[in-house]
Structures are given as structure tokens and as C-alpha cells.
Amino acid sequence: MIHSKRLKMCLCLIILSVFIGACGMKKEESSKDKQIKENFNKTLSLYPTKNLEDFYDKEGFRDEEFDKGDKGTWIVDSEMVVELKDKKMESRSMVLYINRNTRTTKGNFIVRELWEDSKGYAQSKDTKYPVKMEHNRIIPTKQIADDKLRKEIENFKFFVQYGDFKDINDYKDGDISYNPNVPSYSAEYQLSNNDYNVKQLRKRYNIPTKKAPKLLIKGDGDLKGSSIGHKNLEFTFVENKEENIYFTDSINFKPTE
């Protein structure tokens, strides 16, 4: 009888220990999730920045990678990628290097095509059009004979100029992940077509699907901050072996090269 009571007591202690341990793990995981969200929120707070020249006066994260006196360079990049069945993958993107030292900005508008040749080897073709920014306007630095293309470049807007994540904390059922070995971290959310940012993308791009996208926010490097790390957003509308439709955007602060 005494042996039976001791056995029951031991079992209760074991169950209690497991329960306490599980609670501790859950608390630790929740703490890491919170840290990841806080890290992303620092970047997302930059959206929207309607006037790109405001980046001349915006300070980013600095570490030992920066030379003394280097104010740093903001790199903004937006890209729309469409690959339909039995068609070439085509992307149209623009990247700007916003130099805080010289208060000048230059970059490229890039048209990229990817396809497989008759032997199944991947082939690609990039066409770059150099640009500069003055008074928040994109200006091609070389003559472009194609009026439609020239207007597309001059009227280009980066996602940071119109995207808005003020409701990011209301996004539900996010899948937060962290890999300490890289380190890398991400947060993924299923959006609806009524989402503000989705509406803005559809307004500006010909997106050949009615499917609502998933939003993936990902980064790498030290969670506390790193100029070596990289963060970007990805709105994936379609992703399979035959078709891919997605939009990517990034804002990163780096030492000036």
C-alpha cells in the first residue's frame, strides 16, 4: 500500500516536471517570436516613405563594419516576377543606392528573362537601364528610344513609397521560424485580396491570378542587428513547378562601398 502511494507520488512529480518544462519552453519560444517580430517591425516602420530623399536623413543600424565618418548607404529594391505555363520567366525591377555621404542616388532598372533551352539548361538575359534620382524623381541617365519603357521607368514607384504595415500586429496565425545556425528568421502570413498592400500591388502591376498571396518576411544575421544581414519581403501569389508569380521588396542599410 505504501509502495503504491509512493509510486503514484513519483508519477505525479514526473508529470508536473514535464508540464513545467513545457511551459518554460513555450515561454522561451514566445520570447523568441516576440524578438523576431520586434526586429521586423523596425524595418516595417519605414513603410511608407513617400519621398525617397528622406532616406538621406534616416539613420540605420551601425556596427564595426562601417568606417569612421561613413554615413552609410540605403539600398532599396522592388521586383515583380511572372512566370506563366510554357512561358519565359520575366522580372522587372529597380534598385537604388541612396548615398548619405554625397546625398546622391543612382541605380538600375532591370528587365530579366529566364528560360530553359532545348537541352534543358537554364538561360538568362539581363538588360539594365542606368538611372539616377533627383527631387524624388527617377531619371534615366542614357537615352531610351522606347517611349513606353522610358515612361515605365520614370513613373516607377518603390513599394516602400506606398506600402503600409500599420496593421501588421493584427495579422493572424503567423508562422514564425528561427534557425540559430545561420542565423535566419522569418514570419509568414496568409493575406486576403482585401489587404491594403495586396490592393496596392494589383493596382500597379498586371498580376495574372486572383489568388491571394502569402506574405513572407525574412531576414538573416544577428537578431540584435547586423549590417551584414539582409531583410526582404515576398508576396507569393502562385508557386509551383509550372508557374510562379511573386513580388519582392527590400530596404537595407549598408556601409558605403
UniProtKB/Swiss-Prot annotation:
Residues 1-22 form the signal peptide. Keywords: Cell membrane, Lipoprotein, Membrane, Palmitate, Signal. It is a lipid-anchor. It is found in: Cell membrane. A lipid is attached at residue 23 (N-palmitoyl cysteine). Pfam families: DUF576. GO terms for cellular component: plasma membrane. Belongs to the staphylococcal tandem lipoprotein family. This is Uncharacterized lipoprotein SAR2573. It comes from Staphylococcus aureus (strain MRSA252).
